[in-house]
Amino acid sequence: MPSEPISPKDWLAQQPLQSGERLYLIISAASDADALKTLYLTEPTAQLLPIWGGTPYSTWQPVMPYLTELKANSAFLPWIAETDALDWGWLAVSRSAPNEVFEHLRSLTQVKMPDGTEVFFRFWDGRHIYPILRGLGEKAGEVLPVFERYLINGQALEVGTRVVPKVRDWPWWEVPKGLLEGLMAENPSTVIGNMMQWLQEEHADLYFSFPESNLKQKVARFVKRTPLTEENFTGLLKAYLEKEVVV
């Protein structure tokens, strides 16, 4: 169960930044909470790195995730404590330089599902990344080795330090079946969200064949009744929706 939410101020007070540690903000332009606008107002000199820069998605500004470094007394931190939004981004501490952090985040632009399908990884959305990191346990540091501890939607998570390996080309991370099954048992929203995004990017014709709310219900129904151990999980979803269109 989630613990009582903690504010950035209290989180940093409990474990202050040590020499060589940096506070990073991952923030999304896609959130309806206007987090990016608030950041520009409170930190007008912030240097934001577009995480999809240098990829085929570098022009997707309306949904772009960004990386920036903050001071421990940043004027943006109170907004984080006060907002009710859960999809705007998160904070993390690292000993790596901004460019190295940027490259590791960019290497997670897409990941592989257990059936081999490549999907966008919503790492900037705390609703998705927190249960994944928590579910990975000690292996969480293998996915984002540049970060030592996180504050995601008021929940603190520590993964410890490790040697930061060389950045790999995406999609390099294969989402473990066991992790997805655990997420499904606890809350299927992460898997449903990933499948919705996969449909929008890879099969827009199917995606726009239904009102979004209806499509989400159909995807949820499929996800709940189809074992993730199926080798062709995404193919079965596509076939199921194609049949629904015909009907």
Stretch-by-stretch model annotation:
Residues 1-122, 126-247:
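Terminal low-complexity "docking" segments
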